[in-house]
């Protein structure tokens, strides 16, 4: 058995030395922090502030480190009290500002400064970036959100979903599209026929109903038809 900490990299997926460095750093710095810092002295904010200097060292040594630390995390959710869909932005990077734009890939200090959740009333793509002292620290991140008349609504399935990992009970109306690489966004049914009833918030006209389905034969997942 292993006493202490352990970090694994699955070599069969690593094709170049540069990709190995990308997968290893700054994760090895975090592992060292966990192992060598006494519990009473562990402080994530302190570690995050010290990463700036560590990235300078890695750059000087020519290490191809992953810089996701300087990117924006985007999350969307239905605000029941405000009855609106909101996108929240955050970053692990301390003492930094987040600038964003909706449906505009150009993000700079002239863009909107993020201070409160961003309300959306229709399909939109949010672009965002981290800045400090007017200088960009990372890449522009983007995420698309599906906002429509069903977003945030309750629904029932007959029969019930067989598998639903995230936002149970709202996986179909949470404003997030499913992607092949992220199984958590999908819900599954094992039966041939499914009835889904969406409770719209008020009487309104519906012109079109659309949905996505996943096809992954290796996992015995077949598209709806």
Q: How would you describe each model-predicted region?
A:
Residues 91-97, 203-206, 224:
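Short proline/glycine-enriched turn/loop motifs at strand-loop junctions of beta-rich domains
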Residues 106-114:
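Short beta-strand segments within Ig-like beta-sandwich modules, predominantly Fibronectin type-III
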Residues 1-98, 104, 148-161, 168:
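Substrate-binding groove of N-acetylhexosamine-processing glycoside hydrolases
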Residues 125-127, 208:
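Short, conserved beta-strand segments of beta-strand-rich sandwich/propeller modules, principally
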Residues 115-124:
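Solvent-exposed segments in extracellular or luminal domains encompassing
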Residues 139-203, 214-223:
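Disordered, acidic Ser/Thr/Pro-rich linker "stalks" and the adjacent N-terminal cap
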């Amino acid at each position: 058995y292993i006493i202490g900490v352990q970090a694994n990299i699955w070599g069969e997926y690593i094709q170049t030395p540069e990709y190995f460095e990308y997968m290893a750093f700054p994760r090895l710095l975090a592992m060292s922090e966990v192992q060598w810092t006494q519990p009473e002295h562990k402080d994530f904010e302190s570690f995050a502030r010290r990463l700036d200097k560590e990235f300078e060292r890695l750059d000087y040594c020519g290490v191809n480190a992953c810089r996701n630390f300087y990117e924006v995390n985007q999350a969307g959710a239905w605000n029941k009290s405000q009855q609106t869909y909101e996108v929240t932005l955050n970053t692990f990077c301390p003492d930094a500002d987040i600038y964003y734009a909706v449906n505009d890939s150009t993000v700079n200090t002239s863009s909107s400064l993020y201070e409160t959740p961003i309300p959306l009333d229709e399909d939109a793509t949010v672009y965002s970036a981290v800045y400090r002292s007017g200088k960009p620290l990372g890449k522009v991140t983007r995420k698309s959100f599906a906002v429509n008349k069903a977003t945030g609504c309750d629904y029932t399935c007959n029969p019930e979903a067989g598998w639903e990992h995230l936002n149970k009970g709202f996986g179909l109306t949470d404003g997030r599209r499913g992607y092949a690489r992220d199984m958590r966004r999908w819900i599954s049914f094992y039966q041939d026929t499914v009835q889904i009833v969406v409770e719209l918030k008020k009487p309104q006209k519906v012109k079109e109903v659309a949905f996505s389905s996943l096809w992954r034969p290796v996992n015995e997942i077949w598209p709806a038809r």
